[in-house]
């Protein structure tokens, strides 16, 4: 009796195992990694168009033009030559591994939200990984245009080896001021814009 029962159960178990082994489960899409996510930053195309409400800069003494240097945009698209950037503009050079850079980024984001077409806020991510920049952009809600300088060509051209670095550019594309004093806050940024670009925020 037991032997007969075993003969009946063995084929049934084999059939069940065969169904389990050969049945194909539908593939589930892999979760998107940070590198595959859309860029948090804005496109760079508007950087070569003058801000709609910009007025001629009258404060202070004009300096050198921005360097003849072409940088890629974080979002892709056409690279941007810094000589083609239309001011007034505030350029923030930063890296994800730099604590003062991370500290001041929210102030630059708020500044970009208060620009009202009078000036541009531009980021230059330098000596950094793309993933690091993407993570900070997402975590801090930074969405102004971002250029990539994976070396330090921009800083070398300015002869300023500092992080963070802020560059104020007038409507004629000339550098009015560079600041390497550390993390800037809202009040300090507002004071710099009024003093060097004649813009109140």
List where the protein language model places each region.
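Hydrophobic alpha-helical membrane segments, chiefly transmembrane helices and signal peptide h-regions
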Residues: 7-18, 89, 126, 140, ...
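Short, ordered coil/turn segments that flank beta-strands lining enzyme active or ligand-binding pockets
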Residues: 74-76, 171
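Extracytoplasmic
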Residues: 64-66, 85-88, 116, 141
């Amino acid at each position: 009796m037991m032997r007969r029962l075993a003969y009946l159960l063995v084929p049934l178990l084999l059939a069940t195992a065969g169904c389990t082994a050969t049945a194909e489960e539908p593939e589930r899409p892999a979760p998107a990694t940070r590198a595959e996510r859309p860029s948090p930053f804005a496109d760079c195309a508007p950087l070569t168009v003058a801000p709609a409400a910009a007025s001629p800069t009258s404060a202070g003494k004009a300096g050198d033009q921005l360097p003849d240097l072409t940088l890629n945009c974080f979002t892709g698209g056409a690279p941007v030559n810094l000589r083609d950037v239309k001011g007034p503009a505030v350029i923030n050079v930063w890296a994800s591994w730099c604590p003062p850079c991370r500290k001041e980024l929210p102030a630059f984001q708020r500044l970009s939200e208060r620009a009202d077409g009078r000036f541009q806020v531009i980021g230059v991510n330098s000596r950094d990984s793309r993933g690091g920049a993407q993570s900070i952009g997402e975590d801090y809600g930074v969405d102004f245009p971002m250029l990539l300088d994976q070396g330090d060509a921009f800083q070398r051209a300015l002869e300023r080896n500092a992080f963070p670095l802020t560059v104020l550019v007038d409507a004629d594309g000339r550098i009015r001021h560079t600041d390497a004093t550390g993390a800037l806050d809202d009040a300090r940024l507002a004071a710099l814009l009024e003093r060097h670009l004649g813009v109140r925020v």
